């Protein structure tokens, strides 16, 4: 499956906000001007149409969670079939991805690194190795680093970074055992206010 491997800063500049694609100290900073779009001359972004706003919001969320278009549309379709708010359902499906849960627990410094840990079979769910980043974690599931992978330096560094930025309330982590419990699916109020999921619903509803 194709994935973007270019400069992460360029994606954050395109969306005009930090997408948290880099680990802690290397996140979007003064050297990466978010008010300017990528390009040789770094032009300031102009006013967007309603469609443009909807498209940019969809791209922003897609890039935050590292999901390609076809899979993202599949999440939207699943969200629309569920009871309740389609936008909230969409964000919850993305939050329940195993690679995202690994990131939220602090085992990976970024979602991309967390996805790699999953793909390389360094993660277990309820004692069973799972190497599918899109695996949907359920409330009560126990996610852990496999014993032979627990001494990796990058995991120790990621846990330190997570301690600095703060861990979310819907996961509980045992730092000594390098295990975590996904306590519950987060409510919309628990998630970033910087995301306007209604714009995404409007885009796909056309």
Curated annotation (Swiss-Prot):
SMART domains: Ribosomal_S4, S4. Residues 96-156 form the S4 RNA-binding domain. GO terms for cellular component: small ribosomal subunit. The keyword Nucleus does not apply. GO terms for molecular function: rRNA binding; structural constituent of ribosome. GO terms for biological process: ribosomal small subunit biogenesis; translation. It comes from the Bacteria. Gene3D superfamilies: Ribosomal Protein S4 Delta 41, Chain A, domain 1, RNA-binding S4 domain. Keywords: Ribonucleoprotein, Ribosomal protein, RNA-binding, rRNA-binding. InterPro entries: Ribosomal_uS4 (IPR022801), Ribosomal_uS4_bac-type (IPR005709), Ribosomal_uS4_CS (IPR018079), Ribosomal_uS4_N (IPR001912), S4_RNA-bd (IPR002942), S4_RNA-bd_sf (IPR036986). The keyword RNA-binding applies. Coiled coil: none annotated. SUPFAM superfamilies: Alpha-L RNA-binding motif. Belongs to the universal ribosomal protein uS4 family. Part of the 30S ribosomal subunit. Contacts protein S5. The interaction surface between S4 and S5 is involved in control of translational fidelity. HAMAP family: Ribosomal_uS4_B. One of the primary rRNA binding proteins, it binds directly to 16S rRNA where it nucleates assembly of the body of the 30S subunit. This is Small ribosomal subunit protein uS4. It comes from Pseudomonas paraeruginosa (strain DSM 24068 / PA7) (Pseudomonas aeruginosa (strain PA7)).
